[in-house]
Regions:
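N-terminal cofactor/phosphate-binding cores enriched in small/glycine residues
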Residues: 1-41, 54-55
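N-terminal export/assembly segments and adjacent metallocofactor-ligating motifs
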Residues: 24-27, 43-428
Length: 429
């Protein structure tokens, strides 16, 4: 059965507004949209009756009418064209939309392009923005034939309050919303135009979102979220669009050694580092670095980064301890989490979390303190915002007026440094 407005992914409710999934039910006069019809005992559903098949084909023909042709489609492999091919529909006998009514390209956003000439108003992007990511940017404005998808108060996407999570792009079944990296100057693209797919974990924060990297000519062309336990297909702006640095011109691809007499500092032109550095072989560079570090002992200390993998962190501390012969090695996470680790060990017997953040679905009340998830862990924040949207009591405690307060039932904006006394007071209520 063809379907367009129905996603099937977690967080997306069925809407039944595209009417592409019509079926016939015995004893009922009208056809029913199968995605929103709940089955009942002894119900007889006919999916292949002449009436149901004719209705579905008619719907697909109507939807294709206002679409760019498949050769000029913004996404030649879109779900819409897959469903049209399923119904053996390649063109329409109905009159096309008047040229003056065709929506213009909106390329105001650096990461996404909006071509509403391909929009079928399935509202998947609206649900993606308002119900899954809970950013409340995309809406439907106008009535009847003038209805259209808008951003905020009908602003260009790049000037709206869009946070560029890209959920709408991944949800769109027609190519009306596409990654800017996946369409050419004529706005023609293909979501299957990649050589291979690599599944991985987003490297930016600790949420652990699972991602699918689409590789073309050994370069990342675009990224989709996949159904991992931490993200359930969702991504944030960094996870979806923050991979252009991999092929950036400023990345070093060859070892460099500072020229004799070149001043040390940050005033190096990244476009032309040759004024301060010269190219070298790996053997020369590693020998140069080893000679510079040899015999330094306690002059050198190590400070690890939270962006390193566990394996890299292990090798780094081993390098300091065995290479320099001392234990002057630390990690940035210890400084900010030492107190919480001690408290967790004392109270629950483990320094690790005892539940994932999406377990908030099973709670009535949730408190967020010492964190700014909308900025630092946006995918985790979507679960908190959904929790509040469903009627849960979300209490935010922070001296800053962070964005999550818009979704909270209570915002305790205490004075900086007063958190310990505030929590002690709460424990004695």
């Amino acid at each position: 059965i063809p379907h367009l407005c129905h996603s099937g992914k977690k967080g997306y409710r069925s809407d039944g507004n595209c009417r592409a999934c019509m079926v016939e039910i015995d004893g009922e006069r009208t056809l029913a949209a199968s995605c929103i019809r709940t089955p009942t005992p002894d119900m007889v559903v006919k999916t292949e009756s002449h009436r149901a098949k004719s209705a579905r084909k008619m719907v697909m023909e109507l939807l294709v009418t206002d679409q760019p042709s498949n050769e000029k489609a913004h996404d030649k492999s879109s779900h819409l064209w897959d469903m049209a091919n399923l119904e053996d529909v390649s063109e329409s006998r109905f009159p096309e939309l008047e040229i003056e009514r065709i929506p213009l390209l909106d390329d105001s956003h650096v990461a996404m392009n909006v071509n509403l000439d391909a929009c079928i108003q399935c509202n998947l992007c609206v649900r993606a923005c308002r119900e899954v990511q809970v950013n409340d940017v995309i809406g439907l404005a106008g009535r009847g034939h003038d209805a259209k998808i808008v951003f905020d108060m009908d602003d260009p996407m790049g000037e709206s309050s869009c946070v560029a999570c890209g959920e709408c792009v991944q949800a769109c079944p027609t190519g009306a919303l596409m990654p800017a990296s996946n369409v050419d100057a004529s706005q023609i693209g293909d979501s299957m135009d990649f050589d291979r797919e690599v599944k991985s974990v987003c490297p930016f924060c600790g949420v652990g979102c699972q991602i699918s990297l689409k590789i073309k000519d050994d370069k990342v062309k675009w990224v989709d979220g996949i159904d991992g336990p931490a993200n359930e297909n969702r991504l944030c702006v960094k996870g979806r669009f923050g991979f252009d640095y991999i092929d950036h011109d400023h990345r070093l691809t060859k070892p460099l050694i500072r020229r004799d007499g070149a001043p040390k500092g940050l005033n190096v032109n990244p476009e032309d580092p040759s004024s301060h550095f010269r190219e070298a072989s790996w053997e020369e560079a590693l020998t140069f670095a080893a000679n510079g570090l040899r015999g330094r002992g306690r002059e050198v200390a190590g400070f690890g980064s939270a962006k390193c993998t566990n394996e890299e962190a292990y090798l780094f501390q081993k390098f300091i301890r065995q290479g320099f012969g001392h234990n002057n090695v630390d990690h940035c996470t210890r400084l900010c989490h030492a107190s919480s680790v001690a408290a967790l060990m004392e109270n629950v017997g483990s320094a690790a979390v005892t539940a994932t953040f999406n377990e908030i679905e099973n709670s009535d009340v949730a408190i967020v303190i010492g964190a700014n998830p909308t900025e630092n862990h946006p995918v985790a924040a979507t679960y908190f915002k959904q929790f509040s949207k469903r009627g849960g009591k979300l209490i935010v405690m922070d001296p800053r007026g962070q964005a999550l307060k818009r979704h909270s039932s209570h915002m305790l904006q205490f004075r900086p440094g007063a958190d310990v006394s505030m929590l002690n007071a709460i424990m004695h209520v």
